[in-house]
Amino acid sequence: MSEDLPILSPIEARVLGCLIEKKELTPDVYPLTLNAALAAANQKTARDPVMALEQTEVHRALKLLEQKGLVRQMFGSRVERYEHQMAQRFSLTTPQTALIGLLLLRGPQTAHELLARAERMARFSSIEDLRGELDMLIGRRPPLVQEIPRGPGQREDRYVHLLAGPVDVAALSAQRSAPAMPHSDLEARLEALEQEVAALRARLDALGG
């Protein structure tokens, strides 16, 4: 028996993706405080599009995600903390959850892009292993992921999550992608610094209440 998927707004999708990402990348400060979730949502790296959200917007998104059964608020701390419930809600493996998180944070991506970007969140033995996990997400009822056929100027099919509702396959297929850029040392260092700042902010939240 299948159930309808929850439909997420762009802000809800961003916040949910951040919780999925930070659980794997900064487990020592997870579940996230509101301030940590805000910083993660507004990161300049590993986000497409880059957003400039207000604290009230992120807080509202967290509460709406909680109502939809995708996020749970943790109690017993001086500050509110939130954790995602994607794996429990949809019976997902860690690799499948990581793939959904990347699609929530960066939009449509090829299998090779996902393989490179998932490196610190989940382990895939090969591109075929990753495609197998994507096929399982596509084959669910209802599906969580959809494959977008390659369009003009594109070398590979892309994949998109379906948590924001049905997608316009023709429009996405015709959309020209920017050339894939290598993950430069500078970008890697910037991303690491943003992760460190987010972790420090979360620790300060825990100390200061």
Curated annotation (Swiss-Prot):
User: Which branch of life, at top level?
Assistant: Bacteria
Q: What is the lineage of its organism?
A: Bacteria, Pseudomonadati, Pseudomonadota, Alphaproteobacteria, Hyphomicrobiales
InterPro entries per the record?
DUF480 (IPR007432), WH-like_DNA-bd_sf (IPR036388), WH_DNA-bd_sf (IPR036390)
- A Pfam family per the record: DUF480
Record HAMAP family? UPF0502
The cross-references to Gene3D superfamilies, in alphabetical order and at most eight, read: Winged helix-like DNA-binding domain superfamily/Winged helix DNA-binding domain (1.10.10.10)
The molecule here is called UPF0502 protein mll4256
Which family, according to UniProt?
Answer: Belongs to the UPF0502 family.
